[in-house]
């Protein structure tokens, strides 16, 4: 679709509604395919058919370096492909020693080159950090290299701290231009018009599927107005999950990309042989969230036996509030948790974060999740 002026209409209409309710947004984010993209492996609840995908945080641990984290992410994708997961996404984070996916498009290429069928994408690119034209070039190039396998999730959060924003040359008003920037990316990925003077080569015509990522009502309204799939970051910001999904579905306007609402829900799932073992593994993630509030983000830490000795009551309340939508336990517990979440949200797809310290143990968690959900080959 070439740019024919409709973007200006969409932008004006979107702003009229979005400016009425625009809380601050911050997400790491997440997410999937279009309605024409068939799902052959599903979680079955009474009324829903839900695909499973993975958000890989590309964690650098106390026992691995950045190269190890990147290779581990690729290895997760290889196994996920065999186990029936729909897609794997990585996210843009800057100046974080424990996350190695800052150059998100490069990491996507690394993962896609090691796999054959699983979709690979950004969950997401923090678009105000970049020129839309450059993002279109990057993801259009990925789409030429890996046809039919690339997703582009877009968010407007910084993905870093205020000091690093200055190094990124991000301006204070950049987030305000997010709706227009999304339209620009979409236009550059569309087939170029005959009189179009600026073309994103080789991206023009690739029409890489776009996703709107969010953790508030703002993203839900924008995704609905533009007719794009919506991924909610409930794996760390669960409070507005249900209201945001309701807003998105009620206001959705069909588009050339999508003819019906499509929702992805982020969820932390850690599976092990027993509930007790899964809870022990989950302490790695609990410590990571605690460290966010302490301002001491660092490398991923190995699990501990007594999490109560690590955090204060206030820190526990803060961390567990962010982790409220987590499913931790044995395969039976995981099955029940997934079934309940799907029934409550009607999610078309779940984006699974399994933040386990040891690589082999994390693979086992993903395998148990796939088996419990009934998607494993």
Model-derived regions: residue spans:
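N-terminal beta1-alpha1-beta2 module of alpha/beta enzyme domains
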Residues: 36-118
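Conserved, mostly hydrophobic/aromatic
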Residues: 52, 111, 142, 223, ...
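Flexible, glycine-rich active-site loops centered on histidine and acidic residues
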Residues: 50-66, 128-190, 230, 238
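Short, well-ordered coil/turn segments that N-cap beta-strands
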Residues: 48-50, 85-87, 115-120, 146-150, ...
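Hydrophobic faces of well-ordered beta-strands that scaffold small-molecule active sites
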Residues: 52-56, 88-90, 120-122, 150-154, ...
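Active-site mouth loops of central-metabolism enzymes
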Residues: 58-70, 127-132, 208-213, 324-329
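An alpha-helical appendage that flanks or caps ligand/catalytic pockets
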Residues: 48, 172-200, 240-348, 374-377
């Amino acid at each position: 679709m070439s740019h024919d002026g409709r973007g200006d209409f969409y932008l004006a209409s979107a702003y009229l509604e979005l400016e009425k309710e625009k809380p601050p947004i911050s997400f790491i984010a997440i997410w999937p395919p279009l309605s024409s993209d068939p799902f052959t492996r599903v979680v079955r609840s009474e009324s829903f058919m839900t695909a499973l995908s993975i958000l890989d945080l590309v964690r650098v641990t106390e026992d691995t370096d950045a190269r190890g984290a990147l290779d581990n992410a690729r290895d997760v994708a290889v196994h996920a492909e065999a186990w029936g997961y729909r897609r794997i996404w990585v996210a843009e984070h800057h100046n974080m020693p424990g996350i190695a996916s800052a150059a998100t498009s490069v990491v996507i290429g690394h993962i896609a080159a090691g796999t054959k069928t699983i979709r690979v994408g950004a969950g997401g690119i923090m678009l105000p950090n970049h020129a839309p034209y450059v993002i279109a070039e990057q993801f259009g190039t990925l789409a030429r290299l890996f046809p039919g396998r690339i997703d582009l999730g877009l968010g407007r959060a910084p993905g870093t701290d205020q000091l690093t924003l200055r190094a990124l040359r991000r301006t204070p008003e950049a987030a305000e231009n997010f709706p227009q920037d999304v339209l620009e990316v979409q236009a550059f990925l569309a087939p170029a018009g005959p009189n179009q003077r600026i073309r994103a080569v080789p991206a023009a015509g690739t029409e890489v599927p776009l996703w709107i990522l969010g953790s508030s009502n703002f993203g839900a309204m924008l995704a609905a107005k533009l007719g794009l799939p919506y991924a909610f970051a409930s794996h760390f910001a669960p409070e507005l999950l249900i209201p945001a999904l309701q807003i998105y579905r009620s206001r959705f306007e069909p588009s050339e990309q999508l003819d019906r609402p499509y929702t992805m829900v982020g969820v932390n799932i850690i599976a092990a042989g027993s509930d007790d073992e899964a809870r022990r593994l989950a302490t790695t993630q609990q410590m990571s969230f605690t460290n966010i509030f302490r301002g001491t983000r660092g490398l991923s830490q190995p699990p501990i036996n007594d999490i109560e000795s690590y955090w204060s009551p206030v820190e526990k309340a803060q961390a567990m509030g962010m982790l409220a939508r987590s499913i931790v336990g044995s395969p039976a517990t995981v099955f029940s948790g997934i079934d309940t979440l799907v029934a409550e949200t009607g999610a078309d797809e779940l984006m699974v974060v399994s933040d386990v310290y040891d690589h082999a143990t994390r693979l086992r968690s993903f395998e148990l999740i796939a088996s419990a959900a009934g998607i494993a080959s």
